[in-house]
Regions:
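Loop-to-transmembrane alpha-helix initiation sites
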Residues: 143, 159-166, 180-192
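Interhelical loop and helix-boundary elements at the membrane-water interface
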Residues: 2, 18, 23-73, 114-127, ...
Length: 227
């Protein structure tokens, strides 16, 4: 198949469905016989898994959500480059001809997590899967955003603040590190950041009202948060 655009579209669709796998929900049911959507924030991500199902489920959710994002990129990069172009993976590097194609795959995996077709197009907020795709795409940016997240959470005790900082920082970092990358790649990185911020709209409202829950490794919740 020497059609890189078609192959990119196929990889994006596959990445969307891989990204959509709701590991937080699956693990909560497996280990705690709990539907984590029915307590806390109702989210299927790591933070709500921690609040509802505990550290074990949260750690596994974080790991698997990161891995599913990374796997999408690690598979798509050589596949699109070698099969679609007939060139080495350097064709997918930022600034090269095919850089935007990997950006599409990254975006598709994050959108799959946030708009999961397995859950009527409801899902998580995209932080863990986003970390996975960015680490696989260009790990120095991934690590810098992770550091930004950790510092913000350590200072404020709000996971949502760290998540928003990382989401806003992604397109800025991508443009700063790779100013000569394609507009397509920049657009994809910007859309990841914008979508993750949008997914945190309820958290933003709670932060402004002083109702956002702070990070706790010991406190469990069994009821939905007040809206």
């Amino acid at each position: 198949m020497h059609n890189p655009i078609l192959l990119t579209a196929i990889c994006a669709v596959v990445s969307f469905f891989i990204g959509a796998i709701p590991f937080g929900l699956i693990l909560g049911r497996m280990f705690n016989h709990t539907d984590i959507r029915k307590a806390g924030s109702g989210n299927i991500g790591t933070t709500n898994a921690l609040r509802v199902a505990g550290p074990k489920v949260a750690a596994l959710t974080l790991l698997l959500d990161c891995l599913k994002g990374a796997i999408c990129v690690l598979i798509a990069r050589p596949l699109i480059a070698s099969v679609g172009y007939g060139f080495p993976v350097s064709i997918m590097a930022p600034g090269a001809a095919g850089d935007w194609m990997l950006g599409v795959v990254c975006l598709a995996a994050v959108w799959g997590h946030i708009f999961s077709p397995y859950l009527n197009f409801h899902g998580g907020k995209g932080i863990a899967v986003g970390l996975g795709v960015i680490l696989a795409w260009y790990w120095p940016i991934g690590l810098s955003l992770l550091g930004m997240f950790i510092v913000a959470v350590a200072i404020t005790k709000y996971v949502s603040v760290g998540s928003l900082a990382a989401a806003i920082g992604l397109p800025i970092a991508a443009c700063a590190v790779f100013p000569y990358s394609s507009l397509g790649l920049k657009f994809c990185m910007a859309m990841i950041g914008i979508t993750v911020v949008w997914a945190h709209r309820a958290n933003i409202k709670k932060l402004t009202c002083g109702k956002e829950s702070k990070l706790s490794f010991t406190k469990r919740v069994t009821e939905p948060d007040d809206k």
